[in-house]
Structures are given as structure tokens and as C-alpha cells.
Amino acid sequence: WINSKRVPEGGLDAVMLGDSECYSAISPMQLWNEYGVTSFNYAQSGQKIQETYFMLRNVFDNSQPKVVFLETNLLYRKQNRLDMVQSSLDELASYVIPGGGVRLHDTWKVMCGQAPQKTPEYKGFYLNNKVKASKYLDYMDKDKKRSAHISRTVDWYTDRIIELCKENGAELILISNPSTRNWNYTRHEVTEGFAAGKGITYIDLN
């Protein structure tokens, strides 16, 4: 919530939303240096779809980005029914009463040591020097069948995000950043079909 109110003069061309698969994958500074695109990475550790929706509402209250990138790992984040209801109520309360005794999204995670602190200089990007080359190069093998399910809650909030983007003249793009741990060909196929059914663009970088 704090970062989503930090908008550079002239506004934003693009924003990124998602979990830890996103905040070390897309650098707004690099986009600016190489393409002249102004952007901010609003991804946070363990971000849930409810957080994504209300954070995006907050972003649109302060800026009018042309493109919204949504990292797809959060589409598969597991929540039980109680968590889903609680998260939805928490995020609604945070949006209606920002800072009014309600947690400020990633801020409490940083304070508790559960998430890295990202500085404004990098526009939300977390500079991670611990990344190493993976040995599991066959993680996208088409013959390895795994289960992949998108819940009704995620489906419902995705529709709300699509509507929100349309209302604000922004294009929503689903993006899967490279991840040997969290991604596979089954998830690629399910996400591809999910995006096609919603009529939105999907980019898989795996």
C-alpha cells in the first residue's frame, strides 16, 4: 500500500503484480534505461489474489498505467476457505481504511523478517544476488504430467481484475517468469487455456 501510492511525475506506463517470482524478475530501472518505459514492481512475498486486486485498485487511484503484468504463480497459491474469506475481508478493510489499524500488506512481513525490504530506488525490484543456475533443466518436459488447478476464488478475482483494467483503459497480461521450482508444462497448459478463456494475453518465459 505504501509503494502503491508512490507514483513518479508523469505517471506509470506499466505495473507488475505477483509474488516473489516477480519482484526479482522484472526490473523497472532496466525497462527505463533500455526502453524509456516508466514502471513499478508491486510484487510482494506470498501475494494472494485478493491482495493483488485491492492493490491494483489503489494503483489506479493514483496512476493510469497502460499495461498491467500479473505473474501467474499466485494463481496456484493454495488457500483454505477460511483463509479466502479472511484475506478478502482484510484486503477490503485495508483499501477502505488504509493504515487504519489494518496491516499494510508487505510492511509487516518485512518487520517480521519474512520478506526482503525493497528500496524505492529500484522501483519495487528486489536485487537478489543469491540466484544460482539450476540443475533441473527438464522441468518443462511435456511428458511429466502434474496436477494444476485454479480455484473458483482465483477465477472470480481474476475477472474483477480484468474488469478493473478495462475500466481504466489498461491491458492485462499474464506472465510466467522462469522458475524451475514452481513451474511446469502442466501449469503452462492450464494457464494458457485460462487466459484464452478470459480473452487476455499470456506470455510464458519458461
What role is predicted for each listed range?
Residues 1-13:
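N-terminal secretory targeting modules
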Residues 11-12, 37-38, 64-67, 166-173, ...:
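Loop/turn elements at helix/coil->beta-strand transitions in domains of secreted/extracellular proteins
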Residues 16-17, 21-99:
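Membrane-embedded segments
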Residues 32, 165, 193-195:
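A generic structural signal for well-ordered alpha-helical segments
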Residues 46-50, 150-152, 180-187:
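Acidic-and-aromatic substrate-binding clefts and catalytic sites of carbohydrate-active enzymes
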Residues 56, 158-162, 188, 192:
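Generic structural signal for well-ordered alpha-helices
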Residues 81-171:
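Secreted/periplasmic serine-hydrolase-like ester/acetyl group-modifying domain
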Residues 175-205:
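Substrate-gating cap/lid alpha-helix
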